[in-house]
Amino acid sequence: MAKIVKIAGREIIDSRGNPTVEVDVRLGDGTLGRAAVPSGASTGSREALELRDGDKKRFGGKGVLKAVSNVNDIIAPKLTGLEITKQQDIDDIMIKLDGTDFKSSLGANAVLGVSLACAKAGSNSNKLPVYEYVREIYNVKSDKYVLPVPLMNIINGGEHADNNVDLQEFMIAPVSAPTFREALRMGCEVFHGLKKVLNEKGYATGVGDEGGFAPNLKSNAQALEVICEAVKVAGYEVGRDIVFALDVAASELYENNKYTLEGEVKEKVKTSKDMIAFYGDLLKEYPIISIEDGLSESDWDGWKILTEKLKSRLQLVGDDLFVTNTKIFKDGIDKGIANSILIKVNQIGSLSETVAAVQMAYKAGYTAVMSHRSGETEDSIIADLAVALNTGQIKTGSASRTDRMCKYNQLLRIEEELGSKSAYLGKSAFSSIK
């Protein structure tokens, strides 16, 4: 088997014009693996540390030369000579080398860049697609490959846009499609329908970080209304063909045990119970199938009530709540909180820990949703990971911006390659709603 002969990190620029880490891993057989690390806007307080330089004279303090140096000077010497297929060992060595709970010594961006680049190098060396290679090295057993339902973020609010919409993401899920290809087509058509609707109403059609529109709408409900119109303009039926998903990012709205929603006409300040009632009211009006981070990451008592009241009607996703961390996630499972976990590779900082979080979800009867970050690159590995691990759902933005579309295009290629060995589950992908 091929061994690592060289690891090289560098500073590149992400989709928001900020620096990020890219890593090359070169093997003895000449194979190269290259990976770039994403970055979030709204981040959970317990996420693995993204190491930044802090030099205000350079990229406003957001440079990543320290992380790059850690790749080249600390990590590379420890991994050179190792067999590339020993991914778990490679990740364990880096985790031990860092020695902290949140990778605050080496930086999660340094560790993750190396981890993902090793996986790509291994797949290339073994002449396997990344999705197949990941299954092989982690012994993932499944007869079928599942293509994920795209949760397409077509209206951006909150931290992802400069407007008065409180909720961070309004997403559409094309559930009636027979294949991923058709689902993506449906999503693109609704996206274009929404642009037409917004233009006719005199709203701006500039896009946010994740490629969705960021109009200055009057309320959160109005965002759902214009999406309903867009679905009809595209020739689809709301609730049958297209259902909705929300990312509230409620931690960003939470202060002094209360939630403030500036976009609401009545009762801008809400308690946990008020928020749960607010979601209940939205469910009466709109076909919402999933709500992510509906309450703050620190409001576990509220989450318990939210789960008890709405788990039979909704997929309740923990993002900031669980931060792809198996220790935190296990605590949530034991306490009966949420019924789904968002999977972000850079929240935890290694491929092996990411796989462990997905496997923990399945054992507990939770769903797992593969996700991008608001700061992305041309790297499309999360598309492969969604298929490798059969997450059944993926969040990777709207139907614009190449940093988002490259993931969708990779899924198109994977579906074509797999043919009859793959399936698209549609509404059945939301299997934790019980």
Curated annotation (Swiss-Prot):
<dbReference type="InterPro" id="IPR036849">
    <property type="entry name" value="Enolase-like_C_sf"/>
</dbReference>
<dbReference type="GO" id="GO:0005576">
    <property type="term" value="C:extracellular region"/>
</dbReference>
<feature type="binding site">
    <location>
        <position position="395"/>
    </location>
    <ligand>
        <name>(2R)-2-phosphoglycerate</name>
    </ligand>
</feature>
<feature type="binding site">
    <location>
        <position position="319"/>
    </location>
    <ligand>
        <name>Mg(2+)</name>
    </ligand>
</feature>
<comment type="similarity">
    <text>Belongs to the enolase family.</text>
</comment>
<keyword id="KW-0964">Secreted</keyword>
<feature type="binding site">
    <location>
        <position position="247"/>
    </location>
    <ligand>
        <name>Mg(2+)</name>
    </ligand>
</feature>
<keyword id="KW-0460">Magnesium</keyword>
<keyword id="KW-0324">Glycolysis</keyword>
<keyword id="KW-0479">Metal-binding</keyword>
<dbReference type="InterPro" id="IPR000941">
    <property type="entry name" value="Enolase"/>
</dbReference>
<protein>
    <recommendedName>
        <fullName>Enolase</fullName>
        <ecNumber>4.2.1.11</ecNumber>
    </recommendedName>
</protein>
<dbReference type="GO" id="GO:0009986">
    <property type="term" value="C:cell surface"/>
</dbReference>
<dbReference type="InterPro" id="IPR020810">
    <property type="entry name" value="Enolase_C"/>
</dbReference>
<feature type="binding site">
    <location>
        <position position="292"/>
    </location>
    <ligand>
        <name>Mg(2+)</name>
    </ligand>
</feature>
<feature type="binding site">
    <location>
        <position position="168"/>
    </location>
    <ligand>
        <name>(2R)-2-phosphoglycerate</name>
    </ligand>
</feature>
<feature type="active site" description="Proton acceptor">
    <location>
        <position position="344"/>
    </location>
</feature>
<dbReference type="GO" id="GO:0006096">
    <property type="term" value="P:glycolytic process"/>
</dbReference>
<feature type="binding site">
    <location>
        <position position="374"/>
    </location>
    <ligand>
        <name>(2R)-2-phosphoglycerate</name>
    </ligand>
</feature>
<comment type="function">
    <text>Catalyzes the reversible conversion of 2-phosphoglycerate (2-PG) into phosphoenolpyruvate (PEP). It is essential for the degradation of carbohydrates via glycolysis.</text>
</comment>
<keyword id="KW-0963">Cytoplasm</keyword>
<dbReference type="InterPro" id="IPR020811">
    <property type="entry name" value="Enolase_N"/>
</dbReference>
<dbReference type="InterPro" id="IPR020809">
    <property type="entry name" value="Enolase_CS"/>
</dbReference>
<dbReference type="InterPro" id="IPR029017">
    <property type="entry name" value="Enolase-like_N"/>
</dbReference>
<dbReference type="Pfam" id="PF00113">
    <property type="entry name" value="Enolase_C"/>
</dbReference>
<keyword id="KW-0456">Lyase</keyword>
<feature type="binding site">
    <location>
        <position position="344"/>
    </location>
    <ligand>
        <name>(2R)-2-phosphoglycerate</name>
    </ligand>
</feature>
<comment type="pathway">
    <text>Carbohydrate degradation; glycolysis; pyruvate from D-glyceraldehyde 3-phosphate: step 4/5.</text>
</comment>
<feature type="active site" description="Proton donor">
    <location>
        <position position="210"/>
    </location>
</feature>
<dbReference type="Pfam" id="PF03952">
    <property type="entry name" value="Enolase_N"/>
</dbReference>
<feature type="binding site">
    <location>
        <position position="373"/>
    </location>
    <ligand>
        <name>(2R)-2-phosphoglycerate</name>
    </ligand>
</feature>
<dbReference type="GO" id="GO:0000287">
    <property type="term" value="F:magnesium ion binding"/>
</dbReference>
<dbReference type="GO" id="GO:0000015">
    <property type="term" value="C:phosphopyruvate hydratase complex"/>
</dbReference>
<dbReference type="GO" id="GO:0004634">
    <property type="term" value="F:phosphopyruvate hydratase activity"/>
</dbReference>
